[in-house]
């Protein structure tokens, strides 16, 4: 393993994984920024059905990694799984340029994602020894890569799709996926060696796991499922509100509706460095319990962001809300997100046995699957509520998740169980 350090004092392989992930996320967020608008404005699918399709697609994109992680660990290996998965996803993104292939394209992206998604972040963990303190910070750096791609995608894919034609936006997303694949192939020598594949050994499957660890992961997973029912609305019903309920005029310029999807990843990039610096100074106090408490605080902050939207929509009534309120919402939501999502992914990777890295990370994506599916169902309620009441409901979901996580944190450390 190449231990030469570069950016942020991390192994060179992290740069390869960071850039690969960045371009994959560019393709994902580029397509996501267009998806609900494409269905309602181009395919003329109703709002409730479009929200459900959106939620089902995002859910399936995170369900397939459950199987894909097992396939990567037992049969293909992580590198081959990433290459095959990225190739299938690129094909799916290009298929999105053709209306007749819409549902086939969504299926291809979800299937390719199943191989790609658990295999790439689990290689981040493989770059380090299990007791290396840089391991946890690496996932926050990796998370910035997600959000650089997420920031650029709505500006490029969204602008092309909204102003020049939906299919140009989808095509740009496909090009991003190809760029990520090329970077991954070119950087193979810097990646961690493959862990030995150990098919079907039940005793090995149990190695490294105990009852306390399993219950901890289940409890955190359930809590994050509830949280994501609210969080995932940023690309669904919040995006619809940005189109219909927000005054997007900035002087004489009309801000494209897809551009607001760039605010979340932009704020991630701005807020991550100071938060990382703070957490690094307090790393010596870090325990499993403190990580779960951090997640609880994050969920509470996200709930306050939705409370802000509830107050704004209740105050404005039928009038359009100023776009500054939407920007402030994304700032508060993103601050809370950084406390919960990268921390949760890092916790799952931290507790994973070495030979089950992709499988354990895949279980984190099972959490995202269940949360996205719940979010799709919650999204169908948008037309049945006043915006203020709907955003209040989302705040309640985030608050419940915070309470669950706070309760779990008290028994999260092995020495405190029982």
Language-model features and meaning:
Residues 1-12, 129-133, 157-253, 275, ...:
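Intracellular loop-helix junctions on the cytosolic face of multi-pass helical membrane proteins
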Residues 22, 92, 101-116, 318-339:
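Hydrophobic core of transmembrane alpha-helices in multi-pass small-molecule transporters
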Residues 55-72, 117, 262-275:
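Central cavity-lining transmembrane alpha-helices of secondary-active solute carriers
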Residues 61, 134-162, 169-180, 184, ...:
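Glycine-rich segments within core transmembrane alpha-helices of 12-TM secondary carriers
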Residues 65-97:
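Conserved MFS/SLC helix-loop-helix module at the cytosolic interface between two early adjacent transmembrane helices
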Residues 84-104, 297-318:
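C-terminal ends and interior cores of transmembrane alpha-helices
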Residues 253-283, 298-306:
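Transmembrane alpha-helices of Major Facilitator/SLC transporters
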């Amino acid at each position: 393993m190449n231990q030469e350090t570069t950016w942020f004092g991390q192994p060179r392989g992290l740069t390869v994984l960071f850039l690969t992930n960045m371009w994959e996320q560019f393709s994902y967020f580029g397509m996501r920024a267009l998806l609900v608008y494409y269905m309602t404005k181009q395919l003329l699918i109703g709002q409730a059905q479009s929200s459900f399709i959106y939620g089902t697609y995002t859910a399936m994109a995170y369900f397939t990694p459950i199987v894909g992680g097992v396939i990567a660990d037992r049969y293909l290996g992580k590198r081959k799984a990433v290459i095959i998965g990225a190739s299938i996803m690129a094909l799916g993104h290009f298929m999105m340029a053709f209306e007749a292939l819409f549902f086939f394209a969504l299926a291809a992206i979800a299937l390719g994602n199943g191989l790609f998604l658990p295999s790439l972040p689990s290689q981040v963990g493989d770059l380090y020894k299990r007791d290396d303190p840089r391991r946890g910070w690496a996932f926050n750096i990796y998370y910035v890569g997600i959000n650089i791609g997420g920031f650029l995608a709505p500006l490029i894919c969204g602008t092309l799709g909204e102003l020049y034609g939906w299919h140009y936006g989808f095509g740009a997303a496909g090009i991003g996926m190809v760029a990520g694949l090329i970077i991954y192939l070119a950087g193979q020598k810097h990646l961690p060696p493959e862990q030995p594949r150990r098919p079907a050994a039940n005793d090995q499957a149990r190695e490294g796991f105990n009852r306390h660890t399993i219950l901890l992961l289940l409890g955190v997973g359930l809590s994050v499922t509830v949280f994501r029912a609210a969080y995932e609305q940023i690309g669904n019903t919040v995006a619809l509100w940005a189109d219909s309920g927000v005054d997007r005029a900035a002087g004489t310029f009309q801000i494209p509706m897809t551009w607001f999807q760039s605010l979340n990843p932009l704020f991630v990039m701005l807020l991550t460095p100071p938060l990382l610096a703070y957490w690094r100074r307090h790393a010596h106090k870090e325990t499993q319990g403190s990580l779960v408490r951090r997640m609880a605080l994050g969920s509470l902050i996200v709930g306050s962001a939705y409370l802000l939207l509830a107050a704004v929509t209740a105050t404005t009534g039928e009038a359009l809300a100023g776009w500054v309120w939407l920007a402030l919402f994304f700032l508060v939501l993103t601050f809370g997100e950084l406390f919960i999502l990268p921390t949760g992914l890092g916790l799952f990777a931290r507790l994973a046995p070495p030979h089950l890295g992709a499988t354990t990370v895949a279980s984190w994506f099972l959490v995202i699957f269940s949360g996205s599916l719940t979010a799709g169902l919650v999204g169908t309620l948008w037309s049945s509520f006043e915006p203020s009441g709907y955003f209040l409901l989302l705040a309640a979901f985030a608050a419940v998740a915070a309470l669950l996580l706070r309760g779990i944190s008290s028994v999260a450390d092995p020495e405190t169980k029982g």
